[in-house]
Structures are given as structure tokens and as C-alpha cells.
From Swiss-Prot:
Belongs to the BetVI family. It comes from the Eukaryota. It comes from Lupinus luteus (European yellow lupine). Induction: By heavy metal ions. Keywords: Pathogenesis-related protein, Plant defense. GO terms for biological process: defense response. This is Protein PR-L1.
């Protein structure tokens, strides 16, 4: 997806890059 963590299983309101 567009907004995810390591994989598509966890969608968020911000890109994974902000969390990694």
C-alpha cells in the first residue's frame, strides 16, 4: 500500500519512512 510499515498488514496515516 501507500502508507505501511514493514508490510501491507499495518496501514497508517503516514509513510513507513516516518516510523523506521
Amino acid at each position: 500500500g501507500i502508507f505501511t510499515f514493514e508490510d501491507e498488514s499495518t496501514s497508517t496515516v503516514a509513510p513507513a519512512k516516518l516510523y523506521k
